[in-house]
Regions:
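Generic secondary-structure signature for well-ordered alpha-helical cores
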Residues: 25-29, 47-51, 60-68, 79, ...
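C-terminal core of ALDH-fold dehydrogenases
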Residues: 117, 125-233
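Structural motif
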Residues: 10-13, 17-19, 34, 41-44, ...
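Single conserved hydrophobic/aromatic residue that forms the stacking wall/gate
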Residues: 1-12, 232-241
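Short loop-to-beta-strand entry elements in the cores of soluble alpha/beta enzymes
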Residues: 35-46, 62-85, 101-112, 129-137, ...
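A general structural motif
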Residues: 23-25, 48-55, 92, 111-116, ...
């Protein structure tokens, strides 16, 4: 039975948890999907212009999503890195969702100290995180130069939670390094393209056919070569197109 006759739509698109991802996996092929999205991911890129408490709360705010939600901080300040780790320990003592966030941070949390902004940029592009919050004295530079991510959140006011709940930008985003080759859900996912071909003159058909025939024979596709050669050799003259 076709997907339509069984009551399925043509395309399924939405964000969600592991159950949503598994449903997409089972349906993919019979219907189209937007993308396979894994556990939520967050990255904080920060320098000494921001304080450790903000970094810690933003990291743990995403770590509470589940037991396998990566949260990574990149900084060029060892002092900020140490203070952020201390703040994370403090917040986990009082966070109501600490049972989940603690496990996620323990297993998937990282603080990486880089020497330069360029190194932070390179590491961020390599990790290709789903959510990337940039809090530095050169946020726009990261916007101009980052190429691999799901969505950027620029400045300490623009935390990921606001993007989740209020701001309104797309939140079906690539995870597990998929940001290296695709973006998130966009209008193009609801469209499809078609191509068509029409050779307008006998001369063009003859020239194309001569190339096509030789290519087919070189590849060993004799059956392909037959219609190409036949059209090339037998088209009537003055044929309407």
């Amino acid at each position: 039975d076709s997907s339509t006759s069984r009551g399925l739509g043509d395309v399924y698109k939405r964000q969600g948890n592991a159950f949503v991802a598994e449903a997409k996996r089972q349906l993919f092929g019979r219907v189209g999907i937007d993308l396979f999205a894994g556990p939520t991911e967050t990255m904080v890129i920060a320098d000494e212009t921001v304080d450790a408490e903000i970094c810690a709360t933003d990291l743990l705010g995403q770590a509470e999503h589940g037991y396998n939600s990566p949260a990574v901080m990149l900084t060029n300040s060892k002092k900020l890195a140490v203070n952020t780790l201390s703040e994370i320990d403090r917040i986990l003592q009082i966070l109501p969702t600490a049972d989940t966030a603690r496990v996620s941070w323990r297993d998937y949390g990282e603080v990486i100290v880089c020497d330069t902004y360029d190194e932070m940029l390179n590491v961020a592009n390599d990790i290709a995180s789903e959510h990337v919050q940039v809090m530095t004295d050169r946020d726009d530079w990261f916007l101009e130069n980052m190429t691999c991510y799901g969505a950027l959140f620029l400045g300490p006011r623009t935390n990921v939670a606001n993007g989740d709940k209020v701001i309104g930008t797309n939140h079906t985003l690539p995870t597990k390094k998929a940001g290296r080759y695709t973006g998130g859900l966009w209008v193009g996912k609801f469209l499809k393209t078609h191509s068509y071909q029409k050779i307008l003159t006998d001369e063009a058909a003859s020239e194309i056919g001569s190339y096509g025939s030789r290519l087919c024979m070189l590849e060993g596709f004799v059956g392909h070569a037959e219609p190409v050669s036949y059209t090339h050799l037998t088209l009537p003259t003055n044929r309407e197109v």
